[in-house]
């Protein structure tokens, strides 16, 4: 019985010493927070390990986060994950729905963005952009013939209407000369014709009679313009002029009309298009309504996917610019030692307790061995 009590006592003492040793070692990781001096001499192991190595701990944590935890590769995998992309698209749809539900007009949106008199600002912007776009387009195409500027469909459409244009012009000329004003024009031309012939012309005019001659010329002119051969000739003339015109370079057209004048016309058209439209005062939801399905089903997912891939392509630079290591280091250094202790203990409390218990177990085993040796000796 005495032997058993003796061994139990040795194990208890060993467990107490082992457990307390490990407990004190764990406490000394954090405590004391400040160095302790006795008679001007700093006590060894003060301050504790973590307070003493706080800066190095912060730097190592920052490096660990950047090099092993929050890496560009890991962020890229997360960004390009189909589930995440779908979630971003859903978020985009929800945001767009909320935004459209406010019934905000383009004018109100521009005013909220700091634009005063949105209609004037937008019309001038459209005019400048249209003028600039024409200049850039002209610089690219001004030495090319006009036929190269026309799409095949437009060229075919215009050429298919040349014969009908010839008929239209002939009919309009007939209508004009059949009118009273046309008759006066014919009479005037006949009078000038005879006057230019002097006495002979006057005698001819007296013999023929002006009115009957006007009717005769008017009738013959109508027959001439209605004749199929005349219209075919007019169509050939239009074809010749058309082919000549489309062979001119754009620069020649600009020279005839004036490049600045063309630019001003384009700018004025763009300005008028904005000013003479009420879309600035209509709700965005109403303007987008015809395209809402395509906007939500196609545009938003495509925009989300494009934005995510653009972000993914630049992720290394973004991570570098963010300076995650510095952020972690500064954050850890800003923690109070008490808070740092609480954070570490909240993470490793169970493991630290197990270390204390392991020390007690090892102490008990050592005490038992010592007791057995003591009894044997």
UniProtKB/Swiss-Prot annotation:
Coiled coil: none annotated. One of its GO terms (cellular component) is plasma membrane. Its main location: membrane. Pfam families: DUF445. The chain crosses the membrane at residues 7-27, 357-377. It comes from the Bacteria. It is a multi-pass membrane protein. Keywords: Cell membrane, Membrane, Transmembrane, Transmembrane helix. Signal peptide: none annotated. The keyword Transmembrane helix applies. Belongs to the UPF0754 family. This is UPF0754 membrane protein GTNG_0550. It comes from Geobacillus thermodenitrificans (strain NG80-2). The lineage of its organism: Bacteria, Bacillati, Bacillota, Bacilli, Bacillales.
